[in-house]
């Protein structure tokens, strides 16, 4: 398709694949349309920058070069862990303003909102603020000290309780303001920032206060109708001795988190024990965006560094296509499969190195917030080369994959763990050869679940239980149609967390658990013992016509209230997990394949 035809499809709203490509982008509004138009141009520029054999593989569905609407036309990077602590402690310049260390929690979260918008506008992937309970604790203490000072100045009786009460209100208000800021602003990418905040390991009174404020705000919801916010994504660490069991000091906060999850789906949880075992870190590692994980890395002085690090991009390998291409007549040929697998791994390496090469010679001045003002943990000079920051394992670059479920069907046996182990062996060789940290990433595949399946259908027709569904299964996940218990699903997916260490998440589908928090806790605890990163999908919908909070029924034409039959999308709030993030399909539609996949999800019970 020519660039003119693609732009016409955007302007006249006839290109549904483009308009519904990203569930977080409202393609009806000017900023998003402008970003989509720029993306069309960037894709055409990429055709002249990326070697033709890579572009051909991308366009035919053998591989997928992610975010080609941003990179390599411009030297964007993917997702990151923002060094919020360093930025707040050392100050930084934002636009025309010199930001100093905040003196209160309200100012600290206001600055965090501005950092969120700036970072999201200078990269194409997700933004994470890790361990905000610990990082923002000093600003709660400053707020408390100010209230003590006021109480003494005005001779307020019971100064300690006064200061405690005022501080608690200030912390709550600070995170309420942050949540509203995030959900009302647009980045230059034409979307709400993909932002994640993690918490849960702090046990002092200020850290506990922050955790409670985050959860209570999420439980309350947004606006008059108390709708479920999409962002920030909430991720809570669970750990024995901190919050996992009844005798732990933060067990009460875990109970609040369970209530929150039952009403808002978030927080997702990370098992601190398994996370440290997987990443090699001495402290739990937060996901960059929805699921990308860094491994341990030490600076020149031997200190472990997490905040300020990032990912350089993803290329995803179409595993079902390798199997489909390995059939000779009606028989699967193992030797041909091995040959094609190795060829396509080499292809992925070239595609990833092409992405890295696009960053060579680029100066820090292209993204001051990232490279000069501390978001990436450094203060480079404007003319410094950014590529040096990414070498020797400081940044990751990821190889993704999709369709283990379909691959197993085509091969005729459970080959998933075997194939991922072989992929890891290749990645290790690439890392040793180049000095860049290649990681194995379980691709979310919000749009790719449909794109790959559609292209494979065009080539091979309708293949039973593979292409006939209209979507490919997300990474290593069990088929969404398989009727098993949540514990069985966790057990079957858990081994993949320890293989695909560069990115993974598992989730289960449960019925309404608001009145069964003990049951929800049992699922959480089982997940915490067996895998790393986990979420639960539960009904959190709301019909504004009848007031029902039952799950809206998905159909090919939209959602229907199961109580009153309402179909007007403006009269209901529907929330679904698209892949790692939540989305509102009535506000920002899913692609055809993802919509079909959601319709076929069964409850695990």
Swiss-Prot record:
E.C. code: 1.1.98.6
Family label: Belongs to the anaerobic ribonucleoside-triphosphate reductase family.
Annotated organism of origin: Enterobacteria phage T4 (Bacteriophage T4)
Keyword Membrane in record: no
Effect on the protein upon substituting residue 580 to A: Lacks both glycyl radical and activity. Does not affect interaction with NrdG
Organism phylogeny: Viruses, Duplodnaviria, Heunggongvirae, Uroviricota, Caudoviricetes
CDD domains reported for this sequence: RNR_III
Residues the record lists as binding Zn(2+): 543, 546, 561, 564
Name of the molecule in the record: Anaerobic ribonucleoside-triphosphate reductase
Subunit record text: Homodimer. Forms a tetramer composed of two NrdD and two NrdG subunits.
Enzymatic reactions: a ribonucleoside 5'-triphosphate + formate + H(+) = a 2'-deoxyribonucleoside 5'-triphosphate + CO2 + H2O
Occurrences of domain Glycine radical (ranges): 482-605
Residues that bind dATP: 100, 103, 114, 146
Residues annotated for dTTP binding in this entry: 100, 114, 146
Keywords: Metal-binding, Organic radical, Oxidoreductase, Zinc
Record PTM Glycine radical, positions in chain: 580
Superkingdom, taxonomy of origin: Viruses
A biological-process GO annotation: DNA replication
Gene3D superfamilies per the UniProt record, alphabetical: 3.20.70.20
Binding site for dGTP 1: 64, 66-67, 447-448
């Amino acid at each position: 398709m020519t660039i003119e035809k693609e732009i016409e499809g955007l302007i006249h709203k006839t290109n549904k694949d483009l308009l519904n490509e990203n569930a977080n982008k409202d393609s009806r509004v000017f900023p998003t349309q402008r970003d989509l138009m720029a993306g069309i141009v960037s894709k055409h520029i990429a055709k002249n920058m990326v070697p033709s054999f890579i572009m051909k593989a991308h366009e035919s569905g053998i591989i997928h070069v992610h975010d080609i609407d941003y990179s390599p036309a411009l030297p964007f990077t993917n997702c990151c862990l923002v060094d919020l602590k360093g930025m707040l402690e050392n100050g930084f310049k934002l636009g025309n303003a010199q930001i100093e260390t905040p003196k209160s929690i309200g100012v600290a979260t206001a600055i965090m909102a501005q950092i969120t918008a700036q970072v999201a506008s200078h990269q194409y992937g997700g933004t994470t603020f890790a361990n905000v309970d610990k990082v923002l604790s000093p600003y709660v203490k400053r707020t408390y000290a100010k209230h003590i000072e006021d109480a003494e100045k005005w001779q307020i009786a019971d100064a300690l309780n006064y200061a405690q009460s005022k501080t608690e209100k200030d912390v709550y208000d600070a995170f309420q303001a942050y949540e509203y800021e995030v959900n009302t602003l647009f980045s230059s990418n034409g979307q709400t920032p993909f932002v994640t905040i993690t918490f849960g390991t702090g046990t002092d009174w200020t850290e506990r206060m922050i955790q409670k404020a985050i959860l209570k705000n999420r439980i309350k919801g947004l606006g008059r109708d108390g709708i479920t916010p999409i962002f920030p994504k909430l991720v809570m660490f669970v750990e024995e001795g901190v919050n996992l069991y009844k005798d732990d000091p933060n067990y009460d906060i875990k109970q609040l988190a369970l209530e929150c999850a039952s009403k808002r789906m978030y927080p997702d949880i990370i098992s601190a024990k398994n996370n440290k075992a997987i990443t090699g870190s001495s402290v739990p590692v937060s996901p960059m965006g929805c699921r990308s994980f860094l491994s341990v890395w030490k600076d020149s002085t031997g200190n472990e560094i997490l905040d300020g690090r990032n990912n350089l991009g993803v290329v995803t390998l179409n595993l079902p296509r390798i199997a489909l291409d390995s059939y000779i007549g009606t028989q699967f040929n193992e030797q041909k499969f091995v040959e094609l697998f190795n060829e396509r791994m080499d292809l992925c390496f070239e595609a990833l190195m092409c992405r890295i090469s696009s960053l060579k010679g680029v100066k820090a001045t292209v993204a001051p917030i990232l490279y000069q003002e501390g978001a990436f943990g450094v203060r480079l000079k404007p003319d410094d080369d950014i590529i040096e920051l990414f070498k020797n394992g400081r940044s990751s670059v990821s190889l993704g994959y999709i369709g283990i479920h379909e691959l197993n069907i085509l091969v005729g046996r459970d080959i998933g763990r075997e194939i991922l182990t072989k992929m890891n062996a290749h990645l290790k060789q690439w890392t040793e050869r180049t000095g860049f940290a290649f990681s194995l990433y379980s691709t979310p595949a919000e749009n790719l679940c449909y794109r790959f399946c559609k292209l494979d259908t065009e080539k091979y027709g309708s293949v039973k239980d593979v292409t006939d569904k209209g979507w490919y299964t997300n990474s290593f996940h069990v088929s969404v149609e398989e009727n098993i218990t949540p514990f069985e699903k966790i057990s079957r997916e858990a081994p993949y967390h320890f293989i695909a260490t560069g990115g993974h998440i598992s989730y289960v589908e449960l019925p309404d658990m608001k009145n069964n928090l003990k049951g929800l806790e049992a699922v959480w605890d089982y997940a915490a013992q067996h895998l790393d990163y986990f979420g639960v999908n539960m009904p959190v919908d709301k019909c504004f016509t009848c007031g029902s909070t039952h799950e809206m029924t998905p159909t090919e034409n939209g959602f229907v209230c199961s109580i009153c039959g309402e179909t007007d999308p403006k009269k209901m709030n529907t929330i679904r997990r698209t892949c790692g993030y939540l989305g509102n399909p009535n506000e920002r539609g899913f692609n055809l394949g993802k919509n079909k996949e959601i319709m076929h999800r069964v409850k695990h019970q």
